[in-house]
């Protein structure tokens, strides 16, 4: 397993003038909380340099840190591509959820992909549902839209890849908690071929049925592999308050482990991004320990090969 530390906050907005979102601290905070030990001796740790954050969008776009996100994504893509091409599971620790773009850009070089997107928000903001010519925005609310080819070309077009990083019908989004709100930001996602299980549907059908829907998606086409995106705000805020936009209801740790285990142990799984944990909102480190405990008990395909997980 390659554990790729991606210390970025480029996709997030400042909370007040002069503020820098703290997600860039997450990889080191998780390492300090014992993640390397929890994953075991077979994990190799690789670290990307931290990019410089700027609260003001660059000339030519209203996407905050837009061009810096592309540059960081291209670097991350090289790391992920090397892992995937060597047959090694890539665990990418962010950082905000803009890390999904670079991870997919690297994994996609191996062939067509499916995406299992766990997130308390669908992150489907794109020029079709907001005024991109007037409103400043951050990629952290756009990652699924960009991954499916919606948005500015410098964040939807990638070297050696034709078309979007993943087509709509190769995506399942799990955990949205705002889809029943009157002011839901991206209702147009319901008119796409993206499979959705919002948190309310999940509460009705449970882990087994949700897992069956995921497996049905993975069996419905001939993608070379699949990628998992785990935005930790999909967990209930009582469990994971240390995120940009915490909320309830959400998944439990037990739910998440049960959903992830059959995926990370699958030979088709190329890797997983973990995003949006903010150590600045976790002064006693409790949330870091929760994440280390969750990630440390997963039956990654390489760990089962080494015999470290029963």
Where are these regions (language model features)?
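Conserved alpha-helical scaffold segments that buttress catalytic/binding sites
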Residues: 2-310
């Amino acid at each position: 397993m390659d554990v790729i530390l991606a210390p970025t906050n480029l996709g997030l907005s400042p909370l007040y003038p002069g503020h820098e979102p703290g997600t860039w601290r997450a990889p080191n905070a998780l390492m300090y909380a014992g993640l390397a030990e929890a994953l075991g001796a077979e994990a190799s740790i690789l670290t990307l340099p931290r990019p410089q954050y700027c609260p003001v969008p660059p000339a030519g776009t209203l996407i905050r840190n837009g061009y810096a996100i592309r540059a960081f994504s291209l670097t991350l893509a090289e790391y992920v591509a090397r892992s995937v091409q060597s047959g090694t599971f890539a665990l990418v620790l962010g950082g905000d959820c803009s890390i999904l773009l670079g991870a997919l850009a690297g994994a996609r070089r191996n062939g067509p992909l499916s995406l299992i997107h766990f997130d308390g928000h669908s992150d489907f903001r794109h020029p079709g549902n907001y005024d991109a010519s007037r409103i400043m925005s951050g990629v952290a609310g756009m990652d699924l839209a960009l991954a499916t080819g919606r948005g500015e070309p410098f964040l939807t077009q990638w070297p050696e890849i034709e078309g979007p990083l993943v087509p709509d019908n190769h995506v399942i989004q799990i955990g949205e908690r705002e889809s029943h709100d009157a002011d839901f930001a991206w209702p147009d996602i319901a008119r796409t071929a993206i499979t959705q299980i919002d948190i309310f549907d999940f509460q009705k059908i449970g882990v087994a049925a949700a897992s069956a829907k995921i497996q049905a998606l993975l069996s419905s086409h001939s993608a070379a592999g699949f990628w998992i995106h785990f935005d930790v705000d999909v967990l209930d805020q009582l469990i994971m308050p240390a995120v940009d936009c915490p909320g309830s209801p959400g998944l439990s740790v037990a739910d998440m482990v049960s959903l992830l285990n059959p995926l990370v142990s699958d030979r088709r799984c190329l890797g997983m991004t973990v995003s949006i944990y903010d150590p600045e909102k976790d002064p006693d480190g409790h949330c870091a320990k929760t994440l280390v405990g969750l990630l440390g008990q997963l039956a990654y395909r390489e760990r089962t090969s080494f015999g470290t997980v029963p």
